[in-house]
């Protein structure tokens, strides 16, 4: 799936000061990241604060992004959860005509075994009418999809086309790359180790910092894929401090502060998240201004 090689960005849901969805700001952000050179957009992922959105708000976010994108880039829709039957039902009833793939997170909170994870994604694969990208983020789900489970799924179901690997473990990523079928994508879900993963054979990234600074981060990814290592690492180290900063007080609080600094949206997040404090706000604002010089 060539469409998902490079930089995908996990779009935020911008809110007004009254916490309502800011559709105009969302359109500005879509145009900003497309102009910045990213390869695809991820809709209603973790960074979208999807857990705090009503169903009507989710539909509004989808419609707004589809309209703003206007067919320019492939769209990936986040559909996942810890109720397998509910996930399957949405996969069977959702209109996917504007989407190229689904991003589906490993079940959280229930802490399933590896066999439970396999059976969950077996049902997801059988229900989905479009390709599926698995999503492993044990820091949020409390269960790690081991390489053996991922590779078993990849070999058994051809519409499972890749994984967003966000365990933060480069050795685990390399085991996936080593054992994967030829066309299976191993996509970084951790901005800090994206470049090392690419150089180890990874396919790219689904990024948060790449949404805040799309021009610089997507260029780093392209240089890595082209094996222009020295040039890629110049950009990696240029951006490294900002990656730490945007996750310092929660995601997407950090990247929303960048958008506020850029004049694209408010920095409003919904509880239980809170906006970054004044110290971090000042540091992100300074970094953003220095990067644009």
Curated annotation (Swiss-Prot):
Its gene?
A: dapA
Please give the InterPro entries that the UniProt record associates with this protein.
Aldolase_TIM, DapA, DapA-like, Schiff_base-form_aldolases_AS
Q: Does the keyword Cell division apply?
A: no
**What is stated as this protein's family in its record?**
Belongs to the DapA family.
Q: In the Enzyme Commission scheme, what number(s) does this protein have?
A: 4.3.3.7
User: What organism, scientifically named, is this protein from?
Assistant: Flavobacterium psychrophilum (strain ATCC 49511 / DSM 21280 / CIP 103535 / JIP02/86)
Q: Where is the active site?
A: 135, 164
Q: Which SMART domains match?
A: DHDPS (SM01130)
Name of the protein: 4-hydroxy-tetrahydrodipicolinate synthase
Q: Which reaction does it catalyse?
A: L-aspartate 4-semialdehyde + pyruvate = (2S,4S)-4-hydroxy-2,3,4,5-tetrahydrodipicolinate + H2O + H(+)
- Subcellular location field: Cytoplasm
- Work out whether the entry's keyword set contains Calcium: no
High-level lineage? Bacteria, Pseudomonadati, Bacteroidota, Flavobacteriia, Flavobacteriales
- What residues bind pyruvate, as annotated? 47, 206
Q: Which GO terms describe its cellular component?
A: cytosol
Which PROSITE patterns does the record match to this protein?
Answer: DHDPS_2
């Amino acid at each position: 799936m060539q469409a998902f090689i490079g930089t995908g960005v996990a779009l935020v849901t911008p809110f007004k000061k009254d916490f309502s969805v800011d559709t105009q700001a969302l359109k500005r952000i879509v145009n900003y990241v497309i102009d910045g050179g990213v390869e695809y957009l991820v809709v209603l992922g973790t960074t979208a604060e999807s857990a705090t959105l009503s169903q009507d708000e989710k539909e509004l976010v989808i419609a707004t992004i589809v309209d703003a994108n206007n067919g320019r880039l492939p769209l990936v829709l986040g559909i996942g959860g810890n109720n397998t039957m509910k996930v399957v039902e949405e996969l069977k009833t959702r209109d996917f005509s504007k989407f190229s793939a689904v991003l589906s997170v490993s079940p959280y909170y229930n802490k399933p075994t590896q066999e439970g994870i396999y059976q969950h994604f077996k049902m997801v694969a059988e229900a989905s009418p479009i390709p599926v990208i698995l999503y492993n983020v044990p820091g949020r789900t409390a269960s790690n999809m081991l390489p053996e489970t991922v590779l078993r799924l990849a070999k058994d179901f051809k519409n499972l086309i890749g994984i967003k690997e966000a365990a933060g473990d480069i050795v685990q990523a390399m085991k996936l790359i080593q054992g994967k079928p030829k066309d299976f994508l191993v996509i970084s879900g951790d901005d800090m180790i994206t470049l090392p993963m690419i150089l180890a054979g990874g396919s790219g990234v689904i990024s948060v910092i790449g949404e805040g600074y799309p021009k610089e981060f997507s260029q780093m990814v392209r240089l890595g894929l082209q094996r222009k290592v020295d040039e890629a690492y110049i950009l990696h180290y240029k951006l490294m401090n900002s990656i730490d900063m945007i996750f310092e007080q929660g995601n997407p609080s950090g990247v929303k502060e960048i958008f506020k600094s850029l004049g694209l949206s408010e920095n409003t997040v919904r509880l239980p998240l809170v906006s970054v404090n004044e110290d971090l706000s000042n540091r992100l604002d300074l970094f953003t201004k220095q990067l644009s010089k």
